[in-house]
Amino acid sequence: MGQKVHPNGIRLGIVKPWNSTWYANTKEFADNLDSDFKVRKYLTKELEKASVSRIVIERPAKSIRVTIHTARPGIVIGKKGEDVEKLRKVVADIAGVPAQINIAEVRKPELDAKLVADSITSQLERRVMFRRAMKRAVQNAMRLGAKGIKVEVSGRLGGAEIARTEWYREGRVPLHTLRADIDYNTSEAHTTYGVIGVKVWIFKGEILGGMAAVEQPEKPSAQPKKQQRKGRK
C-alpha cells in the first residue's frame, strides 16, 4: 500500500520556510525547542476562536519574536491592544526572555489549508453533512484562484457503524513536484460518534527560483510618471 510523504516537510528549504527560525548551541537548543512547543501550545489554546493559521517564532539577540498569522486580527489584538499585551507577558514568562508579538493578517482564509480544515471541522461538530462541508470548501477555494484542492475526511461519517474515508478533488494537486506550492494541514472534529479526521491539500501554483523567490520582499509598485501638460499655443 503506497504511503505519502508529508507535503510540507519534503519542501522545507526548497519552497517552504521553517516555522521556527533561530540558531542555538548544544546547551540551549533543547530549552529553546521546549519553550517553542509551550508557546505554540499556549497560543493555540488561547486563540482557538481567532482563526490562527500558523505561528512563526524567531529569537534575535536574547529575545523572542512571535508572528501570529490570523484571519481575525481584531480578536487577537483586543480592545486597545489589551489582549495582545496579555499574550506578550505570558509568552515572555514561558520563554524567560523579553517577547515581541506581531500580527499578520491572512487575506484569503479560503486558500489556507489550516483554516479550511478548521472550518470543515467546526461544521462537522455542528452536525452539517460532511459532503456539503467538503464541497463548499472545494468550491470556495477554486473560486478564489486555487489551482487545485483535495479534501479528505475519515472516521464514522454520518454516524456509520464502520469507519471509512471519503475525499473530493478539483484541479491539480501535484505532490511529487517539489517546486509546487502546496499548503497541507489537518484537523480533528470531535463528534458524538467519535473523532473525524480532516486533511486538506491546496495547490497555489509553482514557485520558480526556490527560497529566494519566497523570501523576497514585495517591491513597492512603481508610481506612474506625471505627464507634463503641453502649453497652449
UniProtKB/Swiss-Prot annotation:
Any GO molecular function: rRNA binding
InterPro entries xref list: KH_dom (IPR004087), KH_dom-like_a/b (IPR015946), KH_dom_type_2 (IPR004044), KH_sf_prok-type (IPR009019), Ribosomal_S3_C_sf (IPR036419), Ribosomal_uS3_bac-typ (IPR005704), Ribosomal_uS3_C (IPR001351), Ribosomal_uS3_CS (IPR018280)
S-S bonds: none
Domain spans labelled KH type-2: 39-107
GO BP, sorted A to Z: translation
Protein origin, superkingdom: Bacteria
Cellular component terms (Gene Ontology): cytosolic small ribosomal subunit
Region annotated Disordered, chain positions: 214-233
Keyword Ribonucleoprotein listed: yes
UniProt keyword terms in alphabetical order: Ribonucleoprotein, Ribosomal protein, RNA-binding, rRNA-binding
SMART domains in the record: KH
SUPFAM superfamilies cross-referenced by the UniProt entry: Prokaryotic type KH domain (KH-domain type II), Ribosomal protein S3 C-terminal domain
Subunit structure: Part of the 30S ribosomal subunit. Forms a tight complex with proteins S10 and S14.
Role: Binds the lower part of the 30S subunit head. Binds mRNA in the 70S ribosome, positioning it for translation.
Family: Belongs to the universal ribosomal protein uS3 family.
PANTHER family noted in UniProt: 30S/40S RIBOSOMAL PROTEIN S3, SMALL RIBOSOMAL SUBUNIT PROTEIN US3C
Protein's UniProt name: Small ribosomal subunit protein uS3
